C-alpha cells in the first residue's frame, strides 16, 4: 500500500504542477470493504475551485488507468485542504500571516491570529496578547474560520 501511495504521489505531483497547483496530501485506505484514493490539492495563490479538482481528477484518472498500479476497485476524490486546513510547516504560517488559527502546544491550545514569522518563530495574537512560539513547540495547528 505504501508503494501505491508513493507512486500516486509522484504522478499527482506532476499533474498538479501542470495546473500550477500543489499536492497537499495523498491517502489510500480501505473503509467498510471499499477502497478510497483521496488526493488533496492546494493553490498557493488562490482558493481551489471545483474546476481545479475536476481537472486534476480527470488527468489523474487517465494516468492511473494507463499504468494500472492499483489492484482494487477504488473511489477517487480530489479536494482542497478545506477552510480549517492544517498548518504543517513554517511556510504555511508565513503564507497565512494575518489569518485566524488554532495552535496546540504540549501545555495549551490557543486561538488567535498569526501576526509574524521570523526565523521559525511565530508571533501569535490571542486575547490582545502577543505570544511567540518556536515552530518546534507547536504540536498541531490549523486555520480557523474567522466570522
UniProtKB/Swiss-Prot annotation:
Protein localization: Cytoplasm
Cited InterPro entries: Ribosome_maturation_RimP, RimP_C, RimP_C_sf, RimP_N, RimP_N_sf
Domain of life according to the entry: Bacteria
UniProt KW Repressor keyword: no
One Pfam family in the UniProt entry: RimP_N
Main location class: cytoplasm
GO cellular component: cytosol
Keywords of the record: Cytoplasm, Ribosome biogenesis
Keyword field contains Repressor: no
GO BP terms: ribosomal small subunit assembly; translation
HAMAP family attached to this UniProt entry: RimP
Function: Required for maturation of 30S ribosomal subunits.
Similarity comment text for this entry: Belongs to the RimP family.
Protein name per Swiss-Prot or TrEMBL: Ribosome maturation factor RimP
